[in-house]
Amino acid sequence: MLTRLLRRGTSDTDGSQTRGAEPVEGQRTGPEEASNPGSARPRTRFGAWLGRPMTSFHLIIAVAALLTTLGLIMVLSASAVRSYDDDGSAWVIFGKQVLWTLVGLIGGYVCLRMSVRFMRRIAFSGFAITIVMLVLVLVPGIGKEANGSRGWFVVAGFSMQPSELAKMAFAIWGAHLLAARRMERASLREMLIPLVPAAVVALALIVAQPDLGQTVSMGIILLGLLWYAGLPLRVFLSSLAAVVVSAAILAVSAGYRSDRVRSWLNPENDPQDSGYQARQAKFALAQGGIFGDGLGQGVAKWNYLPNAHNDFIFAIIGEELGLVGALGLLGLFGLFAYTGMRIASRSADPFLRLLTATTTLWVLGQAFINIGYVIGLLPVTGLQLPLISAGGTSTAATLSLIGIIANAARHEPEAVAALRAGRDDKVNRLLRLPLPEPYLPPRLEAFRDRKRANPQPAQTQPARKTPRTAPGQPARQMGLPPRPGSPRTADPPVRRSVHHGAGQRYAGQRRTRRVRALEGQRYG
């Protein structure tokens, strides 16, 4: 009996030393840890890392670095043959891509250091400048025509596409506009009137080039802004229908675009002309197999597949890196989607929340369209694969937007609290970034949030007592309205106004499910 008691005491002592969930003396435990110790700490190291304040910032920087590095490697591999044929050197296209990547890194660093208030202040001016650039590029002698589209400026041998800058400026200005109008509880008309006409002007200028791919990309940005702003579903569906119908009309209006659509519907109709690119891209993907032919060992780039370094670089990735490399690239874009939506849902500023979600949708939509027409699911539109294809202005604009997303990650409430409490980050010290400012909502939004958190019960008005009239005394002498001929037991129905603004006054302010999904902590 004594031996059993000694063994039991020894096991209890060992168990108390190994159990880490029990609080020890001197250790502070919060109310949540005391009530539910299992949920206070993550079970794995990966879960603990995801719960750190700067995890979103590290994730977006790492994903952008991996995509940019992979893009530079594949541009060098896919463009060496064409560069040597055109200029006698295999490094020309790759060198230009490196220079544009440096420009994008500088732009991303500037956006990373920029304050949110200054960004919103210059949003409209930046969009207006890009509209002027879209007008100038249509002037003969100023804009350069390539591949049937007049949409480039050429300066010192470097080409710049103003439509890429217009998309970036429109996303920033649209997020600023919708965030401000949503705070003021503006009507649906007031929310749509500045945004949609401005988008129509930009789309019309891009269509005049003409450029179907950039038109579709601008439509994605507009739909993303409308969707994540929480507008009514009928407004979003009508906008989606308008964008789809416009894209369909543009696809069959011009000769080369209609040829692409016909070749997509029937690839065997003209395999040597309009369907040649799509056919060769499928051959390259099939040639790669599971593990690919090896980096730099592809055959399609030897003048078999036109624009192998640009629009159809995903086919070269599938040929040289195989199915494994293609799935790895898709995994990187999936990680980018998770990171962008994580930052959007954790942001306290409505402007950063809306801009981050829209930008994430834009990059993913463009990647989906590019990969879709390479593998044959969509007709060829000419959209580039973000951060992978050889496109100078596209790469610079995308890196600048990633700088804005990283800036939003630093403005998460937990990140702001950690950085301002002195728990600095190595990456922040290396980049010499300033401390982020906590989000301070306007007084109107703060008052509305307090009213929403503490709703007041509806007060019932007491029934008004009517004086009794003496028998034979008229009601007019008692100060009462004359009685009608027929008795009335209830108040007459109030006729409501049928003015269009009455029903739409606060139609844009309904907290839909997609808005609640992006609602993070409101105050930093």
Swiss-Prot record:
Biological processes per GO annotation? cell division; cell wall organization; peptidoglycan biosynthetic process; regulation of cell shape
The keyword Cell cycle is assigned to this record: yes
Which positions form S-S bridges?
none
- Which of the residues are on side Cytoplasmic? 1-55, 111-121, 173-191, 234, 333-350, 410-524
Give this protein's Gene Ontology molecular function annotations.
lipid-linked peptidoglycan transporter activity; peptidoglycan glycosyltransferase activity
Question: Which reaction does this chain catalyze?
Answer: [GlcNAc-(1->4)-Mur2Ac(oyl-L-Ala-gamma-D-Glu-L-Lys-D-Ala-D-Ala)](n)-di-trans,octa-cis-undecaprenyl diphosphate + beta-D-GlcNAc-(1->4)-Mur2Ac(oyl-L-Ala-gamma-D-Glu-L-Lys-D-Ala-D-Ala)-di-trans,octa-cis-undecaprenyl diphosphate = [GlcNAc-(1->4)-Mur2Ac(oyl-L-Ala-gamma-D-Glu-L-Lys-D-Ala-D-Ala)](n+1)-di-trans,octa-cis-undecaprenyl diphosphate + di-trans,octa-cis-undecaprenyl diphosphate + H(+)
Give me the ranges of the annotated region Disordered.
1-42, 448-524
Q: State the InterPro entries in the record.
A: Cell_cycle_FtsW-rel_CS (IPR018365), FtsW (IPR013437), FtsW/RodA (IPR001182)
- Membrane-traversing stretches: 56-76, 90-110, 122-142, 152-172, 192-212, 213-233, 235-255, 312-332, 351-373, 389-409
- One GO CC annotation, please? cell division site
Q: Which UniProt keywords apply?
A: Cell cycle, Cell division, Cell membrane, Cell shape, Cell wall biogenesis/degradation, Glycosyltransferase, Membrane, Peptidoglycan synthesis, Transferase, Transmembrane, Transmembrane helix
Pathway membership: Cell wall biogenesis; peptidoglycan biosynthesis
Under Pfam families, the record lists: FTSW_RODA_SPOVE (PF01098)
Residue ranges in the Extracellular topological domain are: 77-89, 143-151, 256-311, 374-388
Query: EC number(s) in its UniProt entry?
Result: 2.4.99.28
What topology does the record note for this protein and the membrane?
Multi-pass membrane protein
Free-text function comment from the UniProt entry: Peptidoglycan polymerase that is essential for cell division.
Q: Read off the domain note.
A: Interacts with FtsZ via its C-terminal region, and with PbpB via two extracytoplasmic loops.
* Subunit structure and binding partners: Forms a complex with FtsZ and PbpB (PBP3, FtsI).
Membership in a protein family: Belongs to the SEDS family. FtsW subfamily.
The protein depicted here goes by the name: Probable peptidoglycan glycosyltransferase FtsW
From what organism does this protein derive? Mycobacterium tuberculosis (strain ATCC 25618 / H37Rv)
